[in-house]
Amino acid sequence: MDFKKKPIKKKSITVAYFYEHLSSRLSIKLKKLNQVDEEKRKIYERDIHRPGLALAGFTNLFTYRRVQVFGNTETWFLNHLGTEERKQAFSNITRYKVPCIIVTNNNKLDPELVEMATEAGIPLYRTSHTTTKFIYLITDFLDDQFCHYQHYHGSMVDVYGVGMFITGRSGIGKSEVALDLIERGHRLVADDLVVITRKGESVLMASGTELVRHFMEIRGLGIIDVEAMFGIRAIRHQKRVEIVVELLEFEPGKEFDRTGLENKSVDILGVEVPLVQLPIYPGKNITVIAEVVALNYLLKHYGYDAAEEFDRRIQQQIATRATVNNPAQRAVEYFEHDFE
């Protein structure tokens, strides 16, 4: 499996898309203060900007391509200026092609400023949320929109709460293993085409595409609808990628890890994810092994590593036998424990 694909990132989203999804996905109600074409305005960055310095006249480093938020400070600053000074300060914003302006805390803008924004084609909104809460709410949404992502072939399943991405060459049986896991009570995230998105520094989230989400292709059978067949308990919309299981064809003479002391990983979008490579051949129960992989991951997560514990016992046994077979050491132990 090639995980070295170049990450994809959205270049922009329209203000119309931003407004619609804040309402539908986050239940954030924005009141429109003017009527302009929101499709023509685009947001290019995920960060938020409060343009206090720009209103004061310092626009050398004005990040106008971001969503502009007017909190109490910006609103009160404008309201305490004279009419002409207020217009001049606001024109420092409107002369740039800013995506939109959002006024928080139900603050009000002078009607003349609303008219200036309308003439400049800048959408104006108002929200009852405080500035801090509003920025917190929309930052996560914008992070989702502008984060890096890529499409990978495989099956993503939630196994005992562990996000397992099953990969391997075409036709090796990834979908069949995923289907068997679903039948045993685990949950499908996506099959065949999996969208993996990087959030923050070290979190990878997997989901399916809108078209094929929760559908599976089983060779010889065709397309099946997992949700319709197994019910809502058999699916979930997204899951964190926590371990990658690569299915490999068994090759006589090829060495595979037999102790678990060798910790392999794979780089996905700049994040290292634990990798388990499983050789397969007819009759081998990969589904049960996949469940054990998930349980073993949970044990390691909570501080217990079976391979390390087994290695420790072997080392302890070797040390004990070395002591028993050393005549000088046996003599010392004899006299130290001589109670006659």
From Swiss-Prot:
Cofactor(s) listed: Mg(2+)
Pfam family, one: Hpr_kinase_C
Reactions that this protein is recorded to catalyse: [HPr protein]-L-serine + ATP = [HPr protein]-O-phospho-L-serine + ADP + H(+); [HPr protein]-O-phospho-L-serine + phosphate + H(+) = [HPr protein]-L-serine + diphosphate
Segments of this protein annotated with the region Important for the catalytic mechanism of dephosphorylation: 279-284
Ranges where the record places region Important for the catalytic mechanism of both phosphorylation and dephosphorylation: 216-225
Keyword hit for Kinase: yes
SUPFAM superfamilies, A to Z: HprK N-terminal domain-like, PEP carboxykinase-like
Enzyme Commission identifier(s): 2.7.11.-, 2.7.4.-
Gene Ontology MF term list: ATP binding; magnesium ion binding; phosphorelay sensor kinase activity; protein serine/threonine kinase activity; protein serine/threonine/tyrosine kinase activity
Catalytic site: H153, K174, D192, R258
Annotated positions binding Mg(2+): S175, E217
Subunit structure, interactors included: Homohexamer.
Protein's recorded name: HPr kinase/phosphorylase
